Amino acid sequence: MFFMLETSICNIELRNPTILAAGVMGSMASSLNRIYRGGAGAVVTKSFSLRPNPGYRNPTTVEVTGGVINAIGLSNPGVEAFREELKLVDEEVPLIASVYGASPEEFASAAASVEEYADMIELNVSCPHAMAGCGASIGQDPELTFRVVSAVKDAVDVPISTKLTPNVTDIVEIAGSAEEAGSDALTLINSLGPGMKIDIKTARPILSNAFGGMSGPAIKPVAVRCVYDVYRSVDIPIMGVGGVRDFQDAVEFLFAGARAVQVGTAIMYDGPEVFMKICRGLEAFMMAEGFSSVDEMVGLAHD
């Protein structure tokens, strides 16, 4: 099925370039297996940490024009509980485990704890609504980013991808720090913001945390630009994420320089079937335009 869509990232073979993004249907093995069976080329888990984190109380998401604002707070049951779920993921599923922490040591320990079950580790140094010392507060600092990537690189043997925030002055600088520290790939981008929506009846923010990260179609132009800029400055593969809902969005990311695209918010609108929809459209586009492989499309906007 979709043989012309086959590709690879860091020697991980993918049957197609669509990947479940972190944070959406990624906390249980049953959901991860379902997404893969439904057509995704790989899956990324929800971000998890060494210790359990309850996150923020409801409401944690609110729909806005062009997307969704969320402030879940990186809730997760901790690495020990998560290991039990990862054991149940089907062996044929290319699995990317997303981890976060408040220090390089925490990142390294969390990554090492799940390495045996993962084909790749994704480092969440980019969440815009994380607690102090986590998320974007790391990914906005090139030195901290370097230290986190270096620590994880020393702790695991599987490839690592660093997920970067768009909420910086120069994402190319941060990408360079991650690559220099040993990151094998990059994931661009995490949610934009933080943003806020106010209930005009109560004059209060709708989210319990008041603000959160913006995802969905509205952030796609920012994400595509980030991929485009970073592609020109690094020699490692990029996974593009941010507003992908159809094959046209996927094509834009590929042309900008991504080797694969991650899909998250679109599942809320179109369900898990969105992966198959994107693949069908992408294959038809490639046949119509004379492309024989995904690799031929990567970075074409730079030629």
Curated annotation (Swiss-Prot):
Cellular location(s): Cytoplasm
InterPro entries: Aldolase_TIM, DHO_dehydrogenase, DHOD_1B, Dihydroorotate_DH_1, Dihydroorotate_DH_1_2, Dihydroorotate_DH_cat, Dihydroorotate_DH_CS, Dihydroorotate_DH_I
Gene3D superfamilies: Aldolase class I (3.20.20.70)
SUPFAM superfamilies assigned to the protein according to its UniProt record, in alphabetical order: FMN-linked oxidoreductases
Entry superkingdom: Archaea
GO cellular component terms attached to this protein's record: cytoplasm
Pfam families tied to this protein: DHO_dh
Active-site residues (renumbered): C127 (nucleophile)
PROSITE patterns assigned to the protein according to its UniProt record, in alphabetical order: DHODEHASE_1 (PS00911), DHODEHASE_2 (PS00912)
Catalytic activity, EC: 1.3.1.14
Catalysed conversion reaction: (S)-dihydroorotate + NAD(+) = orotate + NADH + H(+)
Cofactor(s) named in the record: FMN
Pathway participation: Pyrimidine metabolism; UMP biosynthesis via de novo pathway; orotate from (S)-dihydroorotate (NAD(+) route): step 1/1
Annotated binding of FMN, by residue: K46, S47, N124, K163, I189, G216, G242, G243, G264, T265
Function: Catalyzes the conversion of dihydroorotate to orotate with NAD(+) as electron acceptor.
NCBIfam families: PRK07259.1 (NF005574), pyrD_sub1_fam (TIGR01037)
Self-association state and partner proteins as the record states: Heterotetramer of 2 PyrK and 2 PyrD type B subunits.
UniProt record similarity statement: Belongs to the dihydroorotate dehydrogenase family. Type 1 subfamily.
Protein name in the entry: Dihydroorotate dehydrogenase B (NAD(+)), catalytic subunit
Origin species: Methanothermobacter thermautotrophicus (strain ATCC 29096 / DSM 1053 / JCM 10044 / NBRC 100330 / Delta H)
Gene assigned in the entry: pyrD
